[in-house]
Amino acid sequence: MLKNGYIKLYRSLLDWEWYDDTVTKCLFLHLLLTVNAYDEDWKGIVIKRGSRVSSYTKLSEELHFTIKQIRTGIQHLERTGEVARTAYPRFTVFTVTN
């Protein structure tokens, strides 16, 4: 995860269907800000650009929402195609798909 640089947000985000859902909106913006800008190797697997390794627990700690709220937010984002999730035994790779 880069600590510098920027992301571009369009004002049309205001019309996004999840904009009024605080948890889902915060979760999506957090993922946008924390995904890899470049492909990186991590414990023998390649984490692609636009992806990050995390877990529901870790996201819950970072955002100060409950695990259930994080899980529901991820389900919303998966259902509408903004985020994809690949589960492994000890971690999950979240990918921003838009």
Sequence positions of predicted segments:
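Winged helix-turn-helix DNA-binding recognition segment
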Residues: 18, 35-97
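Long, low-complexity, charged/polar intrinsically disordered regions in eukaryotic proteins
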Residues: 1-20
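Short alpha-helical "packing" element that flanks the helix-turn-helix/winged-helix DNA-binding module
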Residues: 27-31
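Short helix-coil-helix linker/hinge
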Residues: 21-25
